[in-house]
């Protein structure tokens, strides 16, 4: 198996884990940066539980589909702009964890109160207050700026973005984030 095939397998697996863990239903997506390229691998608009390593898209940080067939998720800008802003990030999870969404709805956030939470956030996770879907480059840039150098960002009434060094770590931290909430 080539490194590219392994990365694609990991992306598909991470999306199915997100679904199995209850972090997403029909919507949500996990991606991975392609090493040495200003591009990332992400599923199409299909449900994350249907993610297949053979049917992923390669997208640029400018939002263009470079490889693959199918429509990209309208919120692929989340991934594109986090990768553009953060060279240290190799995996991004955009999920809709129920407890995180509930906290953000009441103006609260996730704090590092126990082991799992402390792994994800050393301080309270910031909350992106805008309630729109992140469907443009500008909104993607705003969300990436709100994340800053952190690992997790709650999206008020919407979900959470988790950024890590690779896709495997990103999905594990997304699970930890919901547990901490």
Predicted regions and their residues:
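Glycine-rich flexible loops
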Residues: 1-181
């Amino acid at each position: 198996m080539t490194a590219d095939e392994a990365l694609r397998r990991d992306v598909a697996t991470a999306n199915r884990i997100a679904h199995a863990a209850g972090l997403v239903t029909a919507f949500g997506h996990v991606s991975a940066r392609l090493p040495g390229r200003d591009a990332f691998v992400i599923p199409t608009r299909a449900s994350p539980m249907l993610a297949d390593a053979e049917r992923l898209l390669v997208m640029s940080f400018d939002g263009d589909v470079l490889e693959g067939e199918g429509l990209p998720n309208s919120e692929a800008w989340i991934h594109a702009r986090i990768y553009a802003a953060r060279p240290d990030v190799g995996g991004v999870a955009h999920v809709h964890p129920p407890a995180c969404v509930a906290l953000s709805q009441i103006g609260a956030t996730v704090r590092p109160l126990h082991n799992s939470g402390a792994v994800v956030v050393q301080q309270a996770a910031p909350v992106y207050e805008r309630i729109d879907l992140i469907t443009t480059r500008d909104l993607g840039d705003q969300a990436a700026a709100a994340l800053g150098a952190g690992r997790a960002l709650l999206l008020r009434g919407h979900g959470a973005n988790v950024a890590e060094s690779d896709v495997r770590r990103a999905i594990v931290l997304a699970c930890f984030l919901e547990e901490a909430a």
